[in-house]
C-alpha cells in the first residue's frame, strides 16, 4: 500500500513539473488518501500486535 502512495506521489510531482494541473491534483489526492490509510493500518497493527508478544 505504501508503494502505491509513493507511486502516485511521484506521478503527481512529474505531472506538476510538466504542467498537467488536473492530473497532478488527482494523483496528489490519491496519494494522500493511500498514505492516510497506510498510516492508520500501521498504527493499528502496531498496537494490536504488541499484545501478542
From Swiss-Prot:
It comes from the Bacteria. It is found in: Cell membrane. The chain crosses the membrane at residues 4-24, 29-49. It is a multi-pass membrane protein. Keywords: Cell membrane, Membrane, Transmembrane, Transmembrane helix. GO terms for cellular component: plasma membrane. The keyword Chaperone does not apply. Its main location: membrane. The keyword Plastid does not apply. Belongs to the UPF0391 family. This is UPF0391 membrane protein PSEEN0090. The lineage of its organism: Bacteria, Pseudomonadati, Pseudomonadota, Gammaproteobacteria, Pseudomonadales.
Amino acid at each position: 500500500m505504501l508503494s502505491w502512495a509513493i507511486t502516485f506521489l511521484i506521478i503527481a510531482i512529474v505531472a506538476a513539473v510538466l504542467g498537467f494541473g488536473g492530473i497532478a491534483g488527482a494523483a496528489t489526492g490519491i496519494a494522500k488518501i493511500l498514505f492516510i490509510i497506510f498510516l492508520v493500518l500501521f498504527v493499528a497493527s502496531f498496537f494490536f500486535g504488541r499484545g501478542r508478544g
